[in-house]
C-alpha cells in the first residue's frame, strides 16, 4: 500500500 511505499522512500 501507499503507506509502505512512503516509508521506503523516506
Swiss-Prot record:
Q: Does the keyword tRNA-binding apply?
A: no
Among its keywords, does the record have Membrane? no
Q: Can you list the GO cellular component terms from the UniProt entry?
A: extracellular region
Annotated tissue distribution: Expressed by the venom gland.
Report the PTM annotation: Contains 7 disulfide bonds.
Subcellular location(s): the record lists:
Secreted
Chief location: secreted
**Entry keywords, A to Z:** Disulfide bond, Secreted
- Where do the coiled-coil regions begin and end? none
Please describe the quaternary structure of this protein: Heterotrimer of alpha, beta, and gamma chains; non-covalently linked.
Which family would the database say this protein is a member of? Belongs to the phospholipase A2 family. Group I subfamily. D49 sub-subfamily.
**Function field:** Heterotrimer: Snake venom phospholipase A2 (PLA2) heterotrimer that acts as a potent presynaptic neurotoxin by blocking synaptic transmission and synaptic vesicle recycling. Enzymatic activity is essential for the neurotoxic effects. May act by binding in a calcium-dependent fashion to neurotonal pentraxin-1 (NPTX1) and neurotonal pentraxin-2 (NPTX2), but not to neuronal pentraxin receptor (NPTXR). Also binds to taipoxin-associated calcium binding protein 49 (RCN2), a protein localized in the lumen of endoplasmic reticulum.
- Protein name, please? Neutral phospholipase A2 homolog cannitoxin beta chain 1
